[in-house]
Amino acid sequence: NIDYACYAEDVYVGYRYYEKAGQPVAYPFGYGLSYTKFEYTNLLISDRQVTVQVRNVGNRAGSEVVQLYMANPQDGTYRPLKELRAFEKVFLQPGEGAMVTFLLASRDFAIYQDGWRIPTGTYAVLVGSSSADIRLSQQVIVEEEKVPAPAWLAGSWYAKPAGQPSIGEWRHIMENLPAEAKDAEPGSFSE
């Protein structure tokens, strides 16, 4: 009787796993159908503000979900290749354009390893209509702190995910499994 879910894949859930493992998918994360076409231009990054021009170049009015991903440095710390950081839906008439603005926060660059830390490295700001349909990108160099890879990472499933991780490898991340869940009794609550 298992009363909890073990997400041993950790940060590699959904599109993050498939991209890191190099596995193709039929419908990438963020995929959607539209009756028109959109063009992305003029990606600008100033300080932590990201702007992009989106134009409806089709013959019909339509909506587009503009998605901003952050491509992480792959220098030893275990991280997805890219992560969704923001999105905005715009509705545009044929020929109409809109400037979409995103603000990057420090947490968009951070990992949790003995607290929130921002690793030094080259990141890429990616803008597109899905995780697989990236239209524009621009590199950003971040000078923060050198975050060493955990000693257990080398050679583990998390360094190069494929298939499923073992519970033993998962324990290295979690330090120990969750406590056994107890059967709930009507009228009782945990603190």
Regions found by a protein language model. Name each.
Residues 58-62, 94-96, 132:
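Short flexible coil/turn linkers enriched for glycine and charged/polar residues
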Residues 105-152:
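Terminal connector regions
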Residues 150-188:
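Compositionally biased low-complexity segments at domain edges in trafficked proteins
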Residues 76-113:
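Intrinsically disordered, low-complexity Pro/Gly/Ser/Thr-rich segments with frequent PxxP/GP/PP motifs
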Residues 47-49, 97-101, 135-137:
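Intrinsic-disorder/low-complexity, polar/charged segments enriched in Ser/Thr/Lys/Arg/Asp/Glu/Gln
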Residues 1-63, 69-70, 120, 125-128:
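Secreted, periplasmic, or luminal enzymes acting at the cell surface/secretory milieu
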